[in-house]
């Protein structure tokens, strides 16, 4: 009987320690989320609905940004975590909508998101810490932040690492990276990438919107 009591008490102590560690981990993760959102200007400065003009290139050779319209340019309207229109055509690719949701950081504030801290790594020669988001989406997505600046530096999603740079700010104070380069993983498990990019996007203009343009609103 005494042995059973000792085993019960030992199990209880282990369980309490696990709960305490879990609470501590959750608090540390919450603090990191607060830091990166604060760095971005707070929740009110996270993009939610916007129009942007971009150049998208499927190329393994990095190209310099352009300021003029070319045939590769397109204009889109995005509802973060919602719909995405290219021109007046709704885009049905779920993965790009999830990627944009993460890029906006609003995915970190969704109550359905389970967020866990992941081991630090080096990205673009900079130490980076990571936050993994799951449950709110079908496949987990990893957001990486510069250790020093606390800015978003990369997103790992499915088979690609998307690297962000060339930060800009809207007239209303929303900050965003205007250059994105995508590298497919050679080995996702150990984080190694192919040597050459497979696409790049350059945002030429971005405007936050207060409401959907009339031509995109559902007909009554």
Predicted stretch roles:
Residues 1-5:
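Positively charged n-region of N-terminal signal peptides that target proteins for export
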Residues 127-219:
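Gly/Pro-enriched, hydrophobic low-complexity segments
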Residues 6-17:
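Bacterial N-terminal signal peptides
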Residues 60-66, 89, 190-192:
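Flexible, membrane-facing loop/turn or short amphipathic-helix motifs
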Residues 45-83:
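N-terminal, post-signal-peptide region of Sec/Tat-exported proteins
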Residues 25-31, 38, 45, 80-142, ...:
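Flexible, processing/modification-adjacent segments and terminal tails
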Residues 15, 19-55:
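N-terminal leader/targeting segments and the immediate start of mature chains
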């Amino acid at each position: 009987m005494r042995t059973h009591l000792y085993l019960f008490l030992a199990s209880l102590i282990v369980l309490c320690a696990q709960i305490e560690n879990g609470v501590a981990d959750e608090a540390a993760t919450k603090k990191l989320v607060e830091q990166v959102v604060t760095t971005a200007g707070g929740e009110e400065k996270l993009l939610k609905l916007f129009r942007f003009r971009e150049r998208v290139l499927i190329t393994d050779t990095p190209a310099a940004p352009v300021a003029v319209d070319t045939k590769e340019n397109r204009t889109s309207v995005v509802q973060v975590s919602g719909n995405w229109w290219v021109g007046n055509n709704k885009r049905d690719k779920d993965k790009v909508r999830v990627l944009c949701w993460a890029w906006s950081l609003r995915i970190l504030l969704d109550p359905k998101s389970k967020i866990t801290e992941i081991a630090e790594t080096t990205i673009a020669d900079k130490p980076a810490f990571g936050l993994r988001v799951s449950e709110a989406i079908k496949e987990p997505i990893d957001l990486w932040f510069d250790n020093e600046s606390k800015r978003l530096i990369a997103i790992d999603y499915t088979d690609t690492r998307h690297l962000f740079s060339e930060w800009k700010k809207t007239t209303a104070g929303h900050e965003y990276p205007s250059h994105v380069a995508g590298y497919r993983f050679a080995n996702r498990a150990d984080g190694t990438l192919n040597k050459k990019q497979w696409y790049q996007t350059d945002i030429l203009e971005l405007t936050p919107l207060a409401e959907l343009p009339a031509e995109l609103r559902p007909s009554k």
